[in-house]
Amino acid sequence: MIGRLHHVILDCPDLEASATFWSEVLGQPITYRSEDFWVVAEDDRHSGLAFQLAPGAVPPTWPDPSVPQQIHLDVMVEDLPEAKRRVALLGARHLDGDVYADPAGHPFCLIPMPSWAT
């Protein structure tokens, strides 16, 4: 092993909106805040999802390829209809099927919990 993954970092124009959204989706607290970087993780000793301030960030236009996605996240859920309802209440934008966009426009998929993950 060369190293261990620290964080997956997403550019976003509004740190609070992105971190709060993902904190609610993942059920994890915001563990770090600075002027230009916030982290959502299990606690401050674990890797997590981080947000880097990028005022000029242009969100992907998926499925239209004119502004391609650089990354997307898959979120395993136990109750797909309930998860869809809850992410919409948090401000997610429905793109197609089980694909949504977070407040900064990053696509993510809601996927039924696979049997190996239970």
Segments and roles (model prediction):
Residues I2-R4, P65-Q70:
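Short glycine-enriched loop/turn motifs at secondary-structure junctions
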Residues G56-W62:
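A short, acidic/glycine-rich surface segment
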Residues D14-L15, P68-P107:
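Vicinal oxygen chelate
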